[in-house]
Amino acid sequence: MDYTEKLTRYVANFVDELAKSGVTDVVVSPGSRSTPLALVFTEHPSIKEWIIVDERSAAFFALGLAKKSNRAVAIVCTSGTAAANYYPAIVEAHYSRVPLLVLTADRPHELRHIGAPQTIEQIKMYGDYTKWFHEMAMPEASDKMLHYVRNKASHAKHVAEEGNPGVVHLNFPLREPLTPNFSLDAIWGTKSYTRQNIMQEGTKQLAPNQLQILLEEVGPNKKGLFVCGPQADAEFADAVTSLAGKWGIPVVADPLSQLRTGQHHKDNVIDGYDAFLREAEIRQELKPDYIIRFGAMPVSKSYLFYVMENVETQQYVIEPNEGIRDHSSNQTTFLFADPTTLCQQLEQMTVVDQDVSTAWLKTWQEMNQIAKHYLLEGVEEQITEGEAVRGLAEVIPDGSTLYVGNSMAIRDVDTFYMTSPKTINILANRGANGIDGMVSSGVGASADNERVTLLLGDLSLFHDMNGLFAAKHYKLPITIVLINNNGGGIFSFLPQAKDKRHFEALFGTPMDLSFEQVAKLYEANYNHVKTEEQLKAALYESYQLDGLSIIEVKTDREQNVQWHQAKWQLIKEAILKDG
């Protein structure tokens, strides 16, 4: 058996086992050393390949695809700095718990550390951001080695998705010649080699005595508060809102919790909290007896102030798997159990009498209604960033996905995207919270050909402009709502804005770019809108079109700050007056 046959069978058995383990998509960036992986993935009948030239964009595309599908996506690149360009997306995947299979080609061992071209240190190059690293053996095709390569494939996929999902890195040292021979018989292996390991996990639950202790400490007839951070389980919304309804307590719902949209019970859902928790005097009126938080911390800084001011309040954090995600410094009990199952069990165990007090819930509901009234009222002659979110929420198609950029975009969605009977999957890269890779992530989420609306700022689009190529090349159904305030709008809300000498150069960073020309470059449908009605019309039009659309909303940074502050002041005055 010559080396080409060994290489072909080795790589083909690896790829076939990934497919049998459930991997359906691979994102490939061109390169020579990765030729065997790229060609074999492309030839496999059960795996869809996506070709994206820039590795940084490719990795974020895969991240968006994996986040949307809740399953591992493979990425393939050649040796050298190509692999280094994956780093930002790997960091984001680690912190936001998204499963990625990173498959890097490498020079064989005899070419390392001697100055061979395109050769860098790839062993554990992503450090602690991976759940597992493995240096693959050199290609061989003995029965033992084909069992080995299949075992590593199935194990890699399982590790990426088990527990807290994350990144697995397999490094493939490959010698020349690199081109596989697809004329070989039984290239995908024989039946005896397939499905080396079948791995299944059960649902993690608290023991009955733990549930009873928890129920005695919390439950109805106390001023409790549910807080819901980002969630991916479609059944969670029904479970937590049903329990909240039985206990008569409010549910603070981050936009990524999936509680603001859908058909579940929403009477207890509080969506305007970011606006009214800004005021210290209001926060003082809302001291809870306990807080139960599901998932990571919400986006809202106002909520962070609130929870940190209630340092003596017992806080419980419910996570499906081990790991601490809490920077409030509060006394916290971490309970590692499936959140949906826990809510269902607590509801079944709860016996509620007819005298459950609703005063605590009503206080939150009344403040919430006041906040929503002022946040949603009025129509400006020139569209504001908050109105852009309001208009988007009104016309976005039921059953579609909203991918939200970081910085001001996610904060405006937190403030202005209110509860709706539509079912909208709201996603964002809130692991490391960077603005890089946002275009590619949103485009990746549209890879299943279901409509995605991407809301982001001009710096985010500029930072990842070449992410538009995949949308153009594959004609993916994505509408980009571009909030162009000509720079870093969020800094205008921060203390840095007070130093006028260096603010524009260091923080405002105006670029004066023509995004209409960007749209032309990538053959996108383009609209520039000036009012909320124009935005809604442009959105509706884009949803009838195929492929990529860019809708530009131009705003002024200083006016945007003043508009937000005026809203917050009206809410503060109205709540304190009623109180």
Curated annotation (Swiss-Prot):
<keyword id="KW-0474">Menaquinone biosynthesis</keyword>
<comment type="subunit">
    <text>Homodimer.</text>
</comment>
<comment type="similarity">
    <text>Belongs to the TPP enzyme family. MenD subfamily.</text>
</comment>
<dbReference type="GO" id="GO:0009234">
    <property type="term" value="P:menaquinone biosynthetic process"/>
</dbReference>
<dbReference type="InterPro" id="IPR004433">
    <property type="entry name" value="MenaQ_synth_MenD"/>
</dbReference>
<keyword id="KW-0808">Transferase</keyword>
<dbReference type="InterPro" id="IPR011766">
    <property type="entry name" value="TPP_enzyme_TPP-bd"/>
</dbReference>
<keyword id="KW-0460">Magnesium</keyword>
<comment type="pathway">
    <text>Quinol/quinone metabolism; 1,4-dihydroxy-2-naphthoate biosynthesis; 1,4-dihydroxy-2-naphthoate from chorismate: step 2/7.</text>
</comment>
<dbReference type="Pfam" id="PF02775">
    <property type="entry name" value="TPP_enzyme_C"/>
</dbReference>
<dbReference type="InterPro" id="IPR029061">
    <property type="entry name" value="THDP-binding"/>
</dbReference>
<dbReference type="InterPro" id="IPR029035">
    <property type="entry name" value="DHS-like_NAD/FAD-binding_dom"/>
</dbReference>
<dbReference type="InterPro" id="IPR032264">
    <property type="entry name" value="MenD_middle"/>
</dbReference>
<dbReference type="InterPro" id="IPR012001">
    <property type="entry name" value="Thiamin_PyroP_enz_TPP-bd_dom"/>
</dbReference>
<keyword id="KW-0786">Thiamine pyrophosphate</keyword>
<keyword id="KW-0479">Metal-binding</keyword>
<dbReference type="GO" id="GO:0070204">
    <property type="term" value="F:2-succinyl-5-enolpyruvyl-6-hydroxy-3-cyclohexene-1-carboxylic-acid synthase activity"/>
</dbReference>
<protein>
    <recommendedName>
        <fullName>2-succinyl-5-enolpyruvyl-6-hydroxy-3-cyclohexene-1-carboxylate synthase</fullName>
        <ecNumber>2.2.1.9</ecNumber>
    </recommendedName>
</protein>
<dbReference type="GO" id="GO:0030976">
    <property type="term" value="F:thiamine pyrophosphate binding"/>
</dbReference>
<dbReference type="Pfam" id="PF16582">
    <property type="entry name" value="TPP_enzyme_M_2"/>
</dbReference>
<dbReference type="GO" id="GO:0000287">
    <property type="term" value="F:magnesium ion binding"/>
</dbReference>
<comment type="pathway">
    <text>Quinol/quinone metabolism; menaquinone biosynthesis.</text>
</comment>
<comment type="function">
    <text>Catalyzes the thiamine diphosphate-dependent decarboxylation of 2-oxoglutarate and the subsequent addition of the resulting succinic semialdehyde-thiamine pyrophosphate anion to isochorismate to yield 2-succinyl-5-enolpyruvyl-6-hydroxy-3-cyclohexene-1-carboxylate (SEPHCHC).</text>
</comment>
<dbReference type="GO" id="GO:0030145">
    <property type="term" value="F:manganese ion binding"/>
</dbReference>
<keyword id="KW-0464">Manganese</keyword>
<dbReference type="Pfam" id="PF02776">
    <property type="entry name" value="TPP_enzyme_N"/>
</dbReference>
